């Protein structure tokens, strides 16, 4: 009887997947596609966006219902979110899937994982929360709720290993999407800009609070750079219309005369086209490394937030390239260090045309390439294999 059940699971599993936002849905779509190669008859059910729906995942709830961002929005919708979370647990408990995969959204998914695991359902958390950086005691909650964590980055797995929590490093989907040698000519063509021109890309962040604190020093940096290097032009990708309006308002006050090329999105192409990039910390810094653009990371926040972060954050670096390299590969100019003068000083290392500057740039790009290779592992397939191994009892969580 047991072998009949095992064969049934192996050939025809029910796989529950919950994505809490657009980025999770993209990962979910790639994962389902890879899982279908292994399990053509599998049933996929959970909370899905357009990418997962395109791969025939049944969605029990519209993803828009839970895709809320920011503390104020979350508090505003908290009763509804808690009800949806309880309903999902109830529905999946009745369905009894062979495995549950929660993609990111830890506040939502770890609760679901904990409840389902207690019923004997195997659970995976895909995308590690930043437990290695702050609130490290969350590791115990993760250990209780999951059979396996899928991590994008090798230092994340090393952290879980320290606590004997099952974790598999699968590489990063972004490293799979960006070629090792990005095509600058193609990027310039896509942006409709002259490839013979020198550019600096400026990315002041995707959140309103980031643009609020960074737009002014970044614009002042561009003013100083223009005086020092008159041939430079500036590419400014903005994630949406709201951020564009916010940035334009700051520019009108701080640097009305400054000539900028404002872009709707196209951050990746801007970084590939640029001689150097000035950006906020976050996933953009990893993307910039993969685009092989020498960068300076700048970050400012409220004084109270910075005071708290200094006490909570346990890592030596804040940017992903430096965390990956485990060294100060790119400058991090935080809070009082994030001044136009200091940002210009650091960017000049990449923009000067001396022999040593050219050599430094080449060495940095080589290191970026090595780190790219480290995390370019075909993450979708690696994630699917990890799911299959747990599903078929080849690993124990």
Swiss-Prot record:
Cited SUPFAM superfamilies: UDP-Glycosyltransferase/glycogen phosphorylase
Lineage top rank: taxon: Bacteria
EC number: 2.4.1.182
Recorded metabolic or biological pathway in which this protein acts: Bacterial outer membrane biogenesis; LPS lipid A biosynthesis
GO aspect biological process, one term: lipid A biosynthetic process
Top-rank EC class of the record's enzyme: transferase
Entries under Pfam families matching the protein: LpxB (PF02684)
Keywords: Glycosyltransferase, Lipid A biosynthesis, Lipid biosynthesis, Lipid metabolism, Transferase
GO cellular component, one term: membrane
Catalysed reaction, written as an equation: a lipid X + a UDP-2-N,3-O-bis[(3R)-3-hydroxyacyl]-alpha-D-glucosamine = a lipid A disaccharide + UDP + H(+)
InterPro entries in alphabetical order: Glyco_trans_19
GO MF terms, alphabetically ordered: lipid-A-disaccharide synthase activity; phospholipid binding
Record-stated family: Belongs to the LpxB family.
Known role: Condensation of UDP-2,3-diacylglucosamine and 2,3-diacylglucosamine-1-phosphate to form lipid A disaccharide, a precursor of lipid A, a phosphorylated glycolipid that anchors the lipopolysaccharide to the outer membrane of the cell.
Protein name: Lipid-A-disaccharide synthase
Lineage summary: Bacteria, Pseudomonadati, Pseudomonadota, Gammaproteobacteria, Pasteurellales
GN (gene name): lpxB
